[in-house]
């Protein structure tokens, strides 16, 4: 990845709304960081440039010994979560450095990655938005069924990837080009326009947008 990436781990607190030029803007509040740098990778030693961020308090007794040794080597207290970001400016970071929300000014575009809410086993109407069958006129107790998934002779099989009922949610998902509405550096809060994946309290990764629109933040 040949670009500079700023990132931070945090927890989704929930949604609220703020006023902006007499308009109501829905925002998601993220308790972002502070994170600590636990490792810096370089082209000379590792073959690529990256920075490793650690986040979240944890009882040191619950940390496995290999991971505990990793933190001891970096001379930082153990954290619950670790993420690695490939960035060209990794050499500018140092072990033990604290990363806060100050690197995300208001108006910047960001990508937010998290794990979506798990919905369990769901039918095609809920999972894929199928219209369903008619309410009457010959339809018999099959109103929410998917319909045909493949003819008996042609094609004589079910194609791979056919949308059917199954487990819904609980997957890694990234929402791109969200705008940072406001930043609270005292309380380590990011207010991001729109919704982000996951329930309240879910772990999220906020990064500078990979496909940011030219001329500033995405509208």
Swiss-Prot record:
One of its GO terms (molecular function) is structural constituent of ribosome. PROSITE patterns: RIBOSOMAL_L3. Gene3D superfamilies: 3.30.160.810, Translation factors. Keywords: Ribonucleoprotein, Ribosomal protein, RNA-binding, rRNA-binding. GO terms for biological process: translation. GO terms for cellular component: cytosolic large ribosomal subunit. The keyword Nucleotide-binding does not apply. One of the primary rRNA binding proteins, it binds directly near the 3'-end of the 23S rRNA, where it nucleates assembly of the 50S subunit. Belongs to the universal ribosomal protein uL3 family. Part of the 50S ribosomal subunit. Forms a cluster with proteins L14 and L19. This is Large ribosomal subunit protein uL3.
């Amino acid at each position: 990845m040949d670009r500079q990436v700023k990132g931070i781990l945090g927890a989704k607190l929930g949604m609220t709304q703020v006023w902006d030029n007499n308009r109501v803007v829905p925002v998601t509040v993220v308790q972002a960081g502070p994170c600590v740098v636990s490792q810096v990778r370089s082209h000379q030693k590792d073959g690529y440039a990256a920075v490793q961020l650690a986040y979240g308090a944890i009882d040191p007794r619950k940390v496995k010994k290999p991971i505990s040794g990793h933190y001891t080597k970096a001379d930082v207290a153990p954290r619950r979560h670790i993420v690695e970001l490939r960035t060209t400016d990794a050499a500018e970071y140092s072990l033990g450095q604290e990363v806060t929300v100050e690197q995300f000014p208001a108006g910047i575009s960001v990508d937010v990655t998290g794990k979506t809410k798990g919905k369990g086993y769901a039918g095609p109407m809920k999972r894929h938005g199928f219209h369903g069958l008619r309410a009457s006129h010959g339809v018999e107790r099959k109103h929410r069924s998917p319909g045909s998934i493949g003819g008996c002779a042609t094609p004589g099989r079910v194609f791979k990837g056919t949308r059917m009922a199954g487990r819904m949610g609980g997957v890694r998902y990234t929402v791109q080009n969200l705008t940072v509405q406001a930043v609270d550096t005292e309380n380590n809060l990011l207010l991001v326009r729109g919704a982000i994946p996951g329930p309240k309290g879910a772990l999220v990764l906020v990064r500078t947008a990979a496909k940011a629109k030219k001329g500033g933040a995405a509208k």
